């Protein structure tokens, strides 16, 4: 497993080395299903790109304060199966939060995670989870750089629209914990966004 040779900037053992397979490792949680269908992958990618283009065209009115300025260097993301594989390995641990080492050979990798739960036996569509990241824009102050904003409140939004990020790949798992039906989505992004003192994108 070549992932064991990858040295991440933040240290730690690579997720795909540490866990080594797509076998879910969820303790006493009952795994219902894992992985994304081809359609779900397309829908997640489209949602990212529609949102990036909305920002680029200056159509996002939300913010603290809004609106968000238009962008001149916002390109569409493409799906990357390797990013998706590493994201799926992490999702299959059923641990909400970020893993430590997820980089791939060609670049550093960023990450967004979302978890929803319901006592009804239904699971939110993955696009709904992506929209939760978009909604963080309401707390984003475009007059400040990335580090001037509250990372905990806006970090998923900023990674979604980071202009230098080119690729995305996601993994998903649905499980039951006590009486909660949970859907956990992990998206990995390359090259990573969210660097201190950098702009999300070039404004027009």
Swiss-Prot record:
The keyword Repeat does not apply. Disulfide bonds join 4-17, 8-101, 26-94, 170-187. It is found in: Secreted. Keywords: Allergen, Disulfide bond, Secreted. SUPFAM superfamilies: PR-1-like. The keyword Disulfide bond applies. Coiled coil: none annotated. Residues 45-189 form the SCP domain. One of its GO terms (cellular component) is extracellular region. Expressed by the venom gland. Belongs to the CRISP family. Venom allergen 5-like subfamily. May have an ancestral function in the promotion of ovum fertilization by sperm. This is Venom allergen 5.
């Amino acid at each position: 497993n070549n992932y064991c040779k990858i040295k991440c900037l933040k240290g730690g053992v690579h997720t795909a080395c540490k866990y080594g397979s797509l076998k879910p490792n969820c303790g006493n949680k009952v795994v219902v299903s894992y992985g994304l269908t081809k359609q779900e992958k397309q829908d997640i990618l489209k949602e990212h790109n529609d949102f990036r283009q909305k920002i680029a065209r200056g159509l996002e009115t939300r913010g603290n304060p809004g609106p968000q300025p238009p962008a001149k260097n916002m390109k569409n993301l493409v799906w990357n199966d390797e990013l998706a594989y590493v994201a799926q390995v992490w999702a299959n641990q059923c641990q909400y939060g970020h893993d430590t080492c997820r980089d791939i050979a060609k670049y550093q990798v960023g990450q967004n995670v979302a978890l929803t739960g319901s006592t009804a036996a239904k699971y939110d569509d993955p696009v709904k989870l992506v929209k939760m990241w978009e909604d963080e824009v309401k707390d984003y102050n475009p007059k400040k750089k990335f580090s001037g904003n509250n990372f905990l409140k806006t970090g998923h939004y900023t990674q979604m629209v980071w202009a230098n990020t080119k690729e995305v790949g996601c993994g998903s798992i649905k499980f039951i914990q006590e009486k909660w039906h949970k859907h956990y989505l992990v998206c990995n992004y390359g090259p990573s966004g969210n660097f201190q003192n950098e702009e999300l994108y070039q404004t027009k």
